Amino acid sequence: MRYQISGKQIDIGEALQTHVKTELGVVVKKYAVRPTDALVIFSKSAHEFVCEATVHLSTGLTATAKAHATEIYAAFDACAEKMEK
């Protein structure tokens, strides 16, 4: 699976990228079809971080989720939890 991890007006460190790849890999394993690529975008809105994730599946379906939190890792974890449901 190809990953595209970026930030709008914020730096995305290597540790966060590794965390995203690891956790997102676990989340998408629940789908029966093979995911082809994932796009994760982080941004900051006022006093909180926003994480938007989009995963394209080989069947043509797309799974998306969006979450807000005061910490960037918590924003991603909440986003991944929404995608898992």
Predicted stretch roles:
Residues 1-85:
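N-terminal, polar/charged subdomain of small-to-medium soluble alpha/beta proteins
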